[in-house]
């Protein structure tokens, strides 16, 4: 299934104007609790990493509310989602929802309409949702496969953030792979953790079949069983050209949590004093410590 074959109803949830209208109304209604951060750049072996931390008291309260909600037994914020956070349906199996506690503006979630565990294998419909999003909006899609990979909710959800100057992205890692063939796994020298990059997009752009094929190739290259139930922990990241898979061993190292965006050179700490800890450990060693 190629993006231009999609029903127009599928794409209405990915209309930037619609997204911005829902964001604006969610702010007015007080249901969008944006977390304000400051940031610092840390370079490690020539690779720049952006490290964000919470700054305002309001944002700290929002972060505490998020943590409390995540710990409520049986609480599922996606079944159903807050209607004021819903952008719209994305095919028969997914809906597009605003992240209630965004660190990055316009952070979207592609949530399954029926419950599936976050550790379940990814299906054709998941890659369809991801391909439609990347084809329409560009940016970066990602998936935290289980709590050890940084997932905060057990209900299956892919995520998307827009491309911004100096923001999270794969280009800092794929710059050396520019001549790599299509649909072949590649290892990027200088990255000490197990991983596989696969170029998935050809002249016709992003499509679900090639995105899924790229994922299967990356799983084979990294030793992940793509149809396991449950899947071992892993991170998936994809932009309009590349897909990256990183198997994971644990969610945090020395109190610093890492999700998929860490492998897009973007880290988040809760307290500014943890910046020095990231600097002491080194971003590359931090990412290696939580990988396999």
Locate each region found by the language model.
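Catalytic micro-motifs at enzyme active sites that drive phosphoryl/nucleotidyl and oxygen chemistry
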Residues: 84-85, 95-100, 130, 141-150
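Histidine-centered divalent-metal-coordination microenvironment in nucleic-acid enzymes
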Residues: 112, 146-171
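Short, well-ordered alpha-helical segments in soluble proteins
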Residues: 134-138, 162, 181
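Generic beta-strand structural signal
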Residues: 92-94, 106-107, 137-143, 154-158
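Active-site microenvironments that recognize anionic phosphate/pyrophosphate groups
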Residues: 1-122, 165-210, 216-292
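Short, surface-exposed, charged/polar-biased interaction segments
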Residues: 117, 132, 148-151, 288
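A short glycine-rich, hydrophobically flanked beta-strand micro-motif that places a catalytic Asp/Glu
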Residues: 139-152, 227-239
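Intrinsically disordered, low-complexity linker/loop segments enriched in Gly/Pro
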Residues: 114-136, 142
């Amino acid at each position: 299934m190629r993006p231009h074959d999609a029903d127009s109803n599928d794409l209405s949830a990915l209309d930037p104007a619609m997204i911005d209208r829902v964001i604006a109304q969610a702010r007015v209604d007080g249901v969008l609790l944006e977390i304000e951060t400051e940031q610092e750049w840390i370079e490690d072996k020539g690779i720049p990493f952006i490290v964000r931390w919470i700054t305002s008291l309001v944002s700290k309260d929002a972060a505490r509310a998020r943590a409390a909600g995540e710990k409520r037994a049986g609480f599922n914020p996606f079944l159903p989602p807050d209607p004021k956070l819903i952008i719209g349906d994305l095919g028969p199996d997914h809906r597009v929802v605003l992240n209630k506690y965004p660190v990055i503006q316009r952070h979207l979630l592609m949530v399954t309409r029926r419950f599936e565990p976050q550790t379940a294998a990814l299906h054709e419909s998941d890659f369809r949702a991801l391909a439609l999003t990347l084809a329409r909006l560009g940016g970066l899609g990602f998936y935290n496969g289980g709590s050890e990979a940084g997932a905060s909710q057990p209900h299956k959800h892919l995520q998307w953030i827009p491309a911004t100057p100096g923001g999270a992205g794969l280009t800092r890692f794929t710059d050396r792979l520019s001549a790599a063939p299509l649909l072949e796994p590649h290892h990027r020298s200088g990255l000490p953790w197990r991983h596989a990059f696969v170029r998935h997009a050809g002249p016709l752009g992003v499509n679900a079949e090639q995105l899924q094929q790229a994922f299967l190739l990356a799983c084979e290259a990294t030793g992940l069983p793509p149809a396991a139930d449950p899947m071992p922990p892993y991170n998936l990241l994809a932009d309009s050209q590349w897909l990256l898979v990183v198997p994971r061993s644990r969610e945090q190292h020395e109190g610093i949590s890492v999700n998929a965006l860490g492998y897009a050179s973007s880290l988040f700490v809760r307290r500014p004093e943890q910046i020095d800890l990231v600097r002491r450990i080194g971003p590359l060693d931090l990412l290696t410590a939580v990988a396999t």
